[in-house]
Regions:
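Surface-exposed peri-terminal alpha-helical interaction modules
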Residues: 1-5, 13, 107
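Intrinsically disordered, low-complexity regulatory segments enriched in Ser/Thr/Pro
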Residues: 6-58, 130-152
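Compact, glycine/acidic-enriched structural inserts
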Residues: 25-108
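Long, solvent-exposed, polar/charged low-complexity segments
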Residues: 82-175
């Protein structure tokens, strides 16, 4: 879903946008930062120091966690590296990283099972997004597995997805 600042442009992949993913096992709600964003947008999002990036991710993750707490949804970050034989070809996926950003921070409420700390996942995202040599897409948001999220069968899921997207605002308007 294109955002206001992308209105009137021929290609929504020049700007961050809202994404809903419908999968066999889950529904995703993400803010997507596509490979095609301008260098000025990319630098405002990623060309900050690693601590500032981690702080932005922490704030967004805390807001997502609060917004989905009673749904059994899961905060997620995803990075995908793709290549295309031609502009209109189906992409070949070279790499995918999808993880719960709460693994990077010790300050979130306890979960069952307990989230194990692995801040290196976030370090890897920062490293690849600031030293990219390929077609990379970044996403932050939440996923809702069908088997654990009964809210998916109710209209309330629309409000939950809205809360996820609003929580991700620092990755849409980083200033």
């Amino acid at each position: 879903i294109s955002l206001k600042r992308a209105r009137g442009t021929a290609n929504h992949t020049k700007y961050p946008h809202l994404t809903i993913g419908l999968h066999a096992d889950r529904i995703d709600a993400y803010v997507t930062v596509p490979n095609g964003v301008s260098s000025s947008i990319r630098s405002r999002l990623f060309a900050i120091d690693a601590n500032m990036f981690a702080d932005r991710v922490h704030r967004v993750t805390a807001a997502i966690d609060k917004g989905i707490r009673r749904t059994n949804g899961l905060p997620r970050i995803g990075v995908i590296q793709r290549r295309y034989r031609t502009q209109r070809a189906v992409p070949t996926v070279d790499a995918t990283l999808r993880f719960d950003p709460r693994t990077a921070f010790p300050s979130f409420p306890p979960t069952t099972p307990q989230i194990k700390q692995q801040p290196q996942w976030l370090d890897a995202v920062y490293s690849v997004m600031t030293s990219r040599n390929s077609n990379l897409q970044f996403q932050i948001g939440a996923e809702f597995p069908y088997h654990t999220c009964p809210i998916l069968r109710t209209p309330k899921i629309v409000d939950v997805i809205e809360r996820v997207w609003l929580a991700c605002a620092p990755f849409v308007n980083p200033d």
